[in-house]
Amino acid sequence: MSIKFTEQQLSYMQNAREFVHGRKCYELELPWMDKDAIFWLNDNLKPNYNCLEFGSGGSTLFFNKIVNNINTFEADKNWYNMLREKHNNDKINYNYVYSQNELISKLSNLKKDYYDVCIVDIGSTLSGRNREEIFFKCIPKMKKTTIYVLDNGLSKHHYFNIWKWKLKDFQNILGNHYNMIDFDNAPFNKYAGTRILYPL
């Protein structure tokens, strides 16, 4: 079930040089990622989907309108407290984690073969952050049809090797039934780039 974007949301996303800063994403309940990636997710996520998210915020509020439930992890304590206080409902399970090691440890408690979409976008407040490791550690817990969203891929600070991978490299670990699509409409932003891996 896709949502209908408001005129304010559309106007904000179309203004690339403003949208790239993401200052209104929380207020407008939008993910802070490439606008075409947002449109793709809006068109392809389903109301019965269970979502695993690393990095809470406007994206959490956006996906909350589309999917069945969200299990979200956040490393900024103030941000975590504010979201949980202002947007607490039965569909969203908020988790605070301080470090990469703590997060990886908690992944062992995830339900296996449960999540339909996995979004890796956690911020730099996570001590020892390694988004690439998070992605790899999640795979054994996911379904064979899980959609993966890897954000900020063009930044060397976020993904080290896998952003250089070709589709075949991902198929070697996810299966030949996967396809890949990259979004990058803000080349002036050094943290740009959203990669989505999805089953055919």
Tell me the role of every PLM-derived stretch.
Residues R23-L30, V117-L126:
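Surface-exposed cleft-lining segments at the edges of enzyme active sites
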Residues P31-E102:
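SAM cofactor-binding core of SAM-dependent methyltransferases
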Residues K4-N48:
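Class I SAM-dependent methyltransferase Rossmann-like catalytic core
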Residues Q14-K24, L45-I66, N172-H177, T194-L200:
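N-terminal pre-catalytic "stem/leader" segment of glycosyltransferase-like enzymes
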Residues G55, D76, G123, G153-L154:
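Anionic group-transfer/hydrolysis microenvironments
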Residues S108-V117:
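A short acidic, Gly/Pro-enriched loop at the edge of an enzyme's catalytic core
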